[in-house]
Structures are given as C-alpha cells and as structure tokens.
C-alpha cells in the first residue's frame, strides 16, 4: 500500500514575501500542496508550482520530482502544462507542454507544440521533442516545425541531430545530421542549401547534401542529386548519380542542362 504524506504549505504560501532562500536551499511553492510517495521516492506538486534552487528555476502546473536519500536529494523532475525552465549555471532555458530534467546526467527534454530551448546563443524549436545533454553536448530536435538557429546558421528539418563543442567559452556545432522527407534547409550568411538529407562535419569543414539538392549563392542556383560544401575553402560542387546531369542558373539566364561534376 502506498504511503502518502500531504504537506500543505500554508505558511509558505501566505507569507512568501517574508521568506528569503539561502544558498543551498530549494524553495518550492504550490497552491495544492505536496504529495510524498516515500516508497517510490518521488513527490507531486500541483497547481501553479514554482521551484527555485541554486541550479535552476521552474514553473508548471504539475511537477513530479524523484529523489534518492531524502526529499532534498533531487535526481530528476518531470513537469507538465505551461512549463518554463531556466538554469543560469547550465546556460539553458526553455518552455513547452512537458519538460523532463535529469539533474545527475544534465539532460533536458522538452516536448509538445511550440517547444523552445535556448542554449547560450543556440536556439531550438519544435512541435515534437527537443533533447539536450549538457555533459556530452549532444542534441536531438524531432518532428514538424523543427528549427535550429545560431549566430551563423539557420536550419529546418523533421529531424535535426548533432552535438555542440565548447570552444573558447561558447558552444559551436561540431557535427550535424538533418533529415526531412520533404525538404530541409540549411542557410548560412551567403549560401542557401536544400535537400532531403544532410551531414555536417566541422573537423573537415564539410557539409554533404543528398537527394533533391539545391544550392543557392548570389546569382547562382545549382540543383542535382548530391552536393558538398567546403566551409573552409568557401567552395561547393553539385553532382548527379542518376541522370548524370546537373541543372544550373546564373543571374537571369535560362536554365541549362550540362554534364558537370557527374559521378555516374
């Protein structure tokens, strides 16, 4: 039989203005109190929940917190309904319908329509799921209306997976995989790229594009089955494996078909 202890924070709620949180303490406010499940090692917070600690701040209407040794030894929390989250220590903030945060693994997952996650200068959006592991730097953005935006790049796709590498105190994209059965987009300061699948390798400064490829730069538009952009040399090429033909348009000239950098 489950053991339930209900703690009503009457003093905490009615005299919040008189309370000052000390370093190392976690401040929790809720309108409907706390239900503690000792055997299962979690407790529930309901209605207008606000949690403030040294590591993070969170707001939501239903929060489930898992603990280990005692109530203060928080391991993971799951929040739902109008969730807002911010952590200055991890340089991350976000909001969504549901949020899961594993404190030990430093992994955060936001799900639901109009989900948002901000990691320093990198912005992530989706109507499905956004997951970031702060320890490994890995991230996954999935489902419709998924986007990744940074100071140097704008990406859309049904699936955007990759990792961020800490360089000189800021995170930069180190590798990337983007897929979309329709068309994905990768837009930089001077180049627009479209395809159904793309890979980015920062170590080799290469972006590879597969299927229904279009690369736009200035007055040039080139399409084909495969494209590769060398970000270090600032050069690109497009080839065709199936038709042995590539389409190109330059300035206001008409489309012309020609065998160019073919691989077939």
List each model region and its residues.
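Sec-dependent N-terminal signal peptides
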Residues: 4-12
């Amino acid at each position: 039989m489950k053991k339930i202890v209900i703690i009503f924070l009457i003093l905490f709620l009615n005299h919040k203005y008189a309370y000052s949180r000390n370093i190392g303490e976690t401040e929790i406010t809720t309108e409907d109190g706390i239900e503690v499940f000792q055997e299962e090692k979690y407790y529930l917070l309901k209605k207008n929940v606000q949690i403030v600690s040294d590591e993070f701040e969170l707001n939501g209407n239903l929060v489930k917190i898992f603990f280990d040794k005692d109530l203060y030894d928080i391991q993971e929390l799951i929040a739902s309904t109008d969730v807002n989250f911010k952590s200055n220590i991890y340089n991350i903030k976000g909001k969504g319908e549901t949020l899961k945060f594993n404190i030990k693994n430093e992994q955060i997952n936001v799900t639901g329509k109009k989900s948002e996650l901000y990691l320093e200068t990198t912005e992530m959006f989706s109507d499905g799921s956004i997951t970031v592991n702060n320890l490994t730097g890995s991230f996954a953005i999935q489902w419709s209306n998924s986007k990744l935006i940074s100071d140097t790049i704008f990406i859309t796709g049904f699936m955007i997976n990759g990792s961020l590498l800490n360089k000189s105190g800021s995170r930069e994209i180190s590798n990337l995989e983007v897929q979309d059965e329709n068309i994905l987009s990768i837009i930089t300061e001077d180049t627009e790229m479209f395809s159904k699948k793309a890979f980015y390798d920062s170590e080799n400064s290469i972006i590879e594009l597969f299927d229904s490829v279009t690369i736009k730069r200035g007055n040039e538009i080139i399409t084909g089955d495969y494209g590769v952009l060398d970000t270090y040399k600032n050069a690109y090429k497009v080839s065709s494996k199936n038709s042995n033909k590539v389409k190109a348009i330059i300035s206001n000239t008409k489309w012309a078909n020609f065998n160019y950098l073919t691989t077939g």
